[in-house]
Amino acid sequence: MRKLSFLDRVIEELDSYARFTKVPLNPSKKSPSSDTIDGKLFEIEKKHSAGLMRVDYTGEICAQGLYRGQASVAKSPQTKEHLYHAAAEEYDHLAWCGERLQELGARPSLLNPFWYWTSFGIGAVAGSISDSLSYGFVVETEKQVMKHIDSHLKSLPVNDNRSREILKQMYIDESEHAVEAEKAGGKKLPKTVKAIMKLQSKVMTTLAYRF
C-alpha cells in the first residue's frame, strides 16, 4: 500500500470535514429518538432545546477534530485504528444531533469550522508526543462531554422526549469511550491542562448555545 504524502493527508482531512458539514448526515445506526414522540413544546422551549442540541452538535464536531488529529500522527497502528473507530462512533452522535436540530427548526453553530480545526490541532500536538497522552485527552474529553450531557438532560423541557433519548444514548456511548481509552493506557493529564480544556469547553458551550 502506498504511503500517504503530507498533501494526501491534507486532502483526506479536508474531504472528511466536508462530509461533516453535509446535512443530513448518514449515521450507521438509527437515531435513538426514532420511535419516540414529543409532547407539546412551546416556541421558547423549542429554542432552548435547540440551543442545547447545538452545543452537543458542536461538542461532537470537536470530538471529530480531536480524534482525527490524534489519529493522523498516532505512533502505533493499533492506536490509529482505535481513534478512527471512536471518531466513526462519534459521527453517529453528530448525525443524531444534526437531525434533531433540523426537527427543531434550528441550524448548527456558525463557529463549527473554528472549533473543528482548533480541536484537530490540539489532537495532532497531543498525538505527536505519545499515544498514552493522546488517550489521556480522549478520557478527559469524554468526561467533560458526559458532564455537558448530564446537565442538558436536567435542563431539557419536560416534553422534549426525542432530544432526551438521543442524549441518554450518547451518555452511555461516551462513558464506554472513556473506559476504553483508560484501558488502552490513557495517561492522566496535568491539572493545568484539564483547567485549560474546561475553560475552552466553557467558551464553546456559551457561544454555541447562542450562535
Swiss-Prot record:
Fe cation 1 binds at E60, E90, H93, E174. One of its GO terms (molecular function) is 3-demethoxyubiquinol 3-hydroxylase activity. Binds 2 iron ions per subunit. CDD domains: DMQH. One of its GO terms (cellular component) is plasma membrane. InterPro entries: COQ7_proteobact (IPR047809), Ferritin-like (IPR012347), Ferritin-like_SF (IPR009078), Ubq_synth_Coq7 (IPR011566). It holds the Pfam family COQ7. HAMAP family: COQ7 (MF_01658). Catalyzes the hydroxylation of 2-nonaprenyl-3-methyl-6-methoxy-1,4-benzoquinol during ubiquinone biosynthesis. This is 3-demethoxyubiquinol 3-hydroxylase. It comes from Francisella tularensis subsp. holarctica (strain LVS).
